[in-house]
Amino acid sequence: MAGLKLQAVTKSWDGKTQVIKPLTLDVADGEFIVMVGPSGCGKSTLLRMVAGLERVTEGDIWINDQRVTEMEPKDRGIAMVFQNYALYPHMSVEENMAWGLKIRGMGKQQIAERVKEAARILELDGLLKRRPRELSGGQRQRVAMGRAIVRDPAVFLFDEPLSNLDAKLRVQMRLELQQLHRRLKTTSLYVTHDQVEAMTLAQRVMVMNGGVAEQIGTPVEVYEKPASLFVASFIGSPAMNLLTGRVNNEGTHFELDGGIELPLNGGYRQYAGRKMTLGIRPEHIALSSQAEGGVPMVMDTLEILGADNLAHGRWGEQKLVVRLAHQERPTAGSTLWLHLAENQLHLFDGETGQRV
């Protein structure tokens, strides 16, 4: 059995409306899973269910072969790191890290050894006597993680731990979390609304929407083969271009609303005549020419980002974003002739929104 298993778990506040639809997830021992999605999608509620802070309406939760569905949080073998550091301001770093073990009745020598080891791992050795007010935001977050590490849990639960940090510190802490997981190899479940955190930290990503796991897969899988329109629109910056239209009667072209036809790379005859949504990432559209069969787009604006540029335009009433090389800087109002990589096209069912 996996290090952590959610088996058809649901959550309902009123006994009728499910805020978590039946959800099953197997997390291997030592695996790092990130739950990502917009505010209100249910990811933090699900994490709190694993922690025992919210009751499971239906289904079961298992940690290391033990059913913990009704078990008290303190008995589940979990340690949680929150968005707010929740450090005791009157205690030193050392005392904050040791406090949870002390109230559990652990011996002083064992506590000292665990705190010393956690401080070494997190490079807090020289800060053990300081108070939280004397620390930076990144140092406070490391203390919060140290407090979790000393418990030697079966599972780490992270609830948006980097949200309060500035952009530069978030990058640094992402790297430190990666290094920490490689060192400890503890099963981890991590919640964030930030897709960059999800893609850089996760071994597998669970994309959530409306209490449903839209897709579970590696970061590469959810980026390259999104299972639904929601995943396609949520993962990626800028988001995937999504264009509505229909597959022509021969299954050879996609007819955009507005009359533009785009060639399809075969295998779509069974969808002939059906309303669909075509997706393509901005980096899979290249500049071409009319002679080479390019499709024209009048550019509205150009975003210069430094390493590359983003050209914004329209096909009819549908918006399109194209990622250009650093040296490609067309002027607003100019016509760009575009070539779409046929092997990078994604088709989604017009009714269900699911990938076909």
UniProtKB/Swiss-Prot annotation:
Source organism of this protein record: Escherichia coli (strain K12)
Catalytic activity annotation: sn-glycerol 3-phosphate(out) + ATP + H2O = sn-glycerol 3-phosphate(in) + ADP + phosphate + H(+); glycerol 2-phosphate(out) + ATP + H2O = glycerol 2-phosphate(in) + ADP + phosphate + H(+)
Enzyme Commission code(s) on record: 7.6.2.10
Keyword terms of this UniProt record: ATP-binding, Cell inner membrane, Cell membrane, Membrane, Nucleotide-binding, Sugar transport, Translocase, Transport
Function comment: Part of the ABC transporter complex UgpBAEC involved in sn-glycerol-3-phosphate (G3P) import. Responsible for energy coupling to the transport system. Can also transport glycerophosphoryl diesters, which are hydrolyzed to G3P and alcohol during transport. The G3P moiety can be detected in the cytoplasm whereas the corresponding alcohol is usually found in the culture medium. It was proposed by Yang et al that the complex could also transport glycerol-2-phosphate (G2P) in vivo, but it was shown later by Wuttge et al that UgpB does not bind G2P, questioning this transport activity.
Leftover remarks: The Ugp system can supply G3P as a sole phosphate source but is unable to supply enough carbon for bacterial growth. MalK and UgpC are functionally exchangeable, but UgpC does not complement the regulatory function of MalK in mal gene expression. The hybrid transporters appear to be less efficient than the wild-type systems.
Similarity field: Belongs to the ABC transporter superfamily. sn-glycerol-3-phosphate importer (TC 3.A.1.1.3) family.
Domain of life: Bacteria
UniProt-recorded name of the protein: sn-glycerol-3-phosphate import ATP-binding protein UgpC
Assembly, per entry: The complex is composed of two ATP-binding proteins (UgpC), two transmembrane proteins (UgpA and UgpE) and a solute-binding protein (UgpB).
